[in-house]
């Protein structure tokens, strides 16, 4: 099986260790992985800010970059959601690019979705002794409907004690440009999220979207909270039997 890695902007710039973890995971699964160098931003920031033409340019570049990929895997529910839902919306009325957008969406998977539903992984061999909570991101859980897959994989990590996060469905307040445009509301939302995390007495927060992890993790650091933040890919790569 051949898989192309869609790394995303945040992983490329702020979370390179997540990309490395995805590579380790795919190697463990015996997957042949490549990295199309023509890939760029999925266009979500431009799209959410009303810059439709700029978003279309980014989408077209992505479609071209992954034109020949069999499967496309990304460690981001948010970016996968952009490809799945909004590319088709942008290209309505343009039959050529609409068909290409549909073809791209059909081959694009969020990481945990791919591991569970395509590769059928149910015996993950990694180890991490921690008390943790899992944050469900909005785009991943609501737009893509991916809720159980990451928890199923995390339940297979030896030593990992996953606690139930109160109000787990609540947004962390990031929302891409929302955190900039509505900063005071965003701050209140992330403060509420941190209170809920602390209530579990967990010392590790796990998530599957780096925007959420950047937002919550940044707040935790500014408030000197002793809670580690990791992407689900990093957790799955911990202590792998390589």
Curated annotation (Swiss-Prot):
GO MF: oxidoreductase activity
Supply one GO CC term from the record.
cytosol
A Pfam family that this protein carries is CCG
Which superkingdom does the taxonomy of this entry point to?
Bacteria
InterPro entries, from UniProt? Cys_rich_dom, LutA
Please give the biological process terms from Gene Ontology that the record holds.
lactate metabolic process
Q: Cross-referenced PANTHER family, in alphabetical order?
A: LACTATE UTILIZATION PROTEIN A (PTHR30296:SF0), UNCHARACTERIZED PROTEIN YKGE (PTHR30296)
Q: What does this protein do?
A: Is involved in L-lactate degradation and allows cells to grow with lactate as the sole carbon source.
Similarity comment: family membership: Belongs to the LutA/YkgE family.
Q: What is this protein called?
A: Lactate utilization protein A 2
- Give the originating organism: Bacillus cereus (strain AH820)
């Amino acid at each position: 099986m051949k898989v192309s890695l869609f790394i995303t902007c945040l992983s490329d710039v702020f979370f390179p260790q997540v990309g490395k973890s995805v590579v380790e995971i795919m190697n463990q699964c015996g997957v042949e992985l490549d990295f199309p160098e023509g890939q760029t931003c999925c266009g979500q920031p431009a799209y959410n800010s009303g810059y439709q033409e700029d978003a279309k340019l980014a989408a077209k570049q992505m479609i071209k970059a992954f034109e020949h990929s069999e499967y496309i895997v990304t460690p981001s529910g948010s970016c996968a959601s952009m490809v799945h839902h909004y590319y088709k919306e942008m290209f309505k009325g343009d039959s050529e690019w609409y068909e290409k957008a549909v073809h791209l969406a059909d081959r694009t998977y969020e990481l945990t979705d791919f591991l569970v539903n395509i590769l059928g992984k149910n015996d993950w061999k990694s180890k991490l002794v921690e008390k943790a909570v899992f944050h469900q991101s909005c785009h991943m859980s609501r737009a893509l409907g991916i809720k159980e897959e990451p928890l199923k994989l995390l339940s297979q990590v030896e030593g990992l004690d996953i606690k139930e996060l109160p109000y787990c469905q609540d947004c962390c307040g990031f929302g891409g440009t929302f955190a900039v445009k509505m900063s005071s509301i965003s701050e209140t939302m992330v403060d509420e999220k941190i209170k809920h995390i602390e209530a579990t007495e967990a010392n590790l927060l796990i998530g599957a979207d780096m925007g959420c992890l950047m937002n919550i993790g940044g707040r935790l650091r500014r408030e000197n909270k002793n809670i580690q933040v990791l992407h689900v890919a990093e957790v799955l790569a911990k202590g792998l039997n390589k």
